[in-house]
A protein has these predicted regions:
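Substrate-recognition "cap/lid" segment bordering the active-site pocket of phosphatases
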Residues: 81-133
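Acidic, Mg2+-coordinating phosphoryl-transfer loop and its flanking beta/alpha structural elements
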Residues: 123-159
Length: 166
């Protein structure tokens, strides 16, 4: 969900720039996590922000995700799977965010879990750890932290997802 249909990186940058005098911008080195771009003494701030109630409630939508996912539902049984248990405060935020921005996804097609051990035909994700032992077709959704990964079929945008799957 995060970095695939919702944008937590942009929100982190906004919060960081609000709280610190040295601005952080959207230019993130390939293969690095966002928190590697802040001074060492405030590196943990990322984890504080994402553990705050409300952090996930107003994230921006990844462009074209709504339209393409709605179209995918005409051809596939679509599930939203999020490893939300890692950040327990996010459960209600993510549920409410999905209800607002993806109301066409039935609540029975939303899975909050610890590990994405789902058995599906296709998984679109930004984290390669979720593809370990995954039996289906993994599609790696581009995010700064995975730009150096070459082992998986990559999609950079939801338009590319549509081109491959519709």
């Amino acid at each position: 969900m995060d970095e695939v249909i919702a944008d937590p990186i942009k929100k982190f940058i906004q919060l960081y720039n609000r709280d610190y005098t040295v601005p952080l911008d959207l230019k993130i080195d390939a293969g690095n996590e966002i928190y590697h771009h802040v001074p060492k003494d405030v590196e943990q701030k990322w984890f504080e922000y994402i553990n705050e109630p409300g952090f996930f409630r107003d994230l921006e939508i990844i462009p074209d995700s709504q339209r393409v996912i709605k179209a995918l539902q005409q051809k596939y049984e679509v599930y939203i799977v999020s490893a939300a248990m890692e950040f327990p405060n996010c459960l209600k935020d993510k549920h409410d965010w999905l209800a607002d921005h993806f109301p066409f996804i039935d609540w029975q097609h939303i899975i909050f879990c610890g590990n994405k051990i789902v058995n599906t035909d296709i998984m679109i994700d930004d984290r390669i750890k979720n593809f370990v032992n995954y039996p289906g077709r993994p599609l790696l959704f581009t995010s700064p932290h995975n730009l150096l990964v070459t082992d998986y079929e990559r999609v950079n945008t939801w338009e590319e997802v549509a081109g491959l799957l519709l």
